[in-house]
Design a protein with these regions (language model features):
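N-terminal targeting/export leaders
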Residues: 2-150
């Protein structure tokens, strides 16, 4: 009976430590929602883990069917990866925008490598190229000063 009484607190302590460790890992894995004003962005880039610019392009207004403004950039290789290519896009409402939809798509990258997507020198997101060399990211970026979404 004494052994059982001693085991119960030890098991309880181990469970508490395991739950606490899990919660810390979960909280460390969360990141804050990105903010930034890309409504007048001019340059989109894809950089490799060494910071070299693999793809680069200039944003320009694109024709849009709905009531949004869309800016697109054709991403062209810079000599770091000769067959890499991609596109970047920023889309937002014409009237009182609060959120921008930011998209990057790159292909023919080094499979398994990590890339950073950059707009006007500001890191927006990172992604790892899949086994075919494709890397994509799509996210909503809140404009500075815009109310937080629920």
């Amino acid at each position: 009976m004494t052994n059982k009484v001693q085991i119960i607190p030890v098991v309880g302590l181990l469970c508490t430590v395991a739950v606490a460790g899990y919660m810390v890992a979960q909280l460390n894995g969360q990141s804050t929602a990105p903010t930034g004003d890309y409504t007048n962005a001019s340059v989109a880039e894809v950089r490799d883990a060494q910071g070299q610019i693999v793809l680069s392009g200039q944003f320009a207004i694109a024709e849009e069917e709905d009531d949004d403004i869309e800016r697109k950039a054709a991403l062209e290789q810079t000599g770091v990866d000769a067959d890499a290519a991609g596109e970047a896009e920023v889309e937002f409402a014409k009237a009182a925008p609060t959120v921008q939809e930011v998209e990057f798509a790159a292909r023919n990258l080094q499979p398994g490598a990590t890339f950073t997507f950059v707009i006007d020198g500001q890191d927006v997101a990172t992604a790892t190229a899949d086994r075919r060399g494709n890397a994509e990211v799509e996210l909503e970026v809140r404009l500075p000063g815009a109310p937080a979404s629920r």
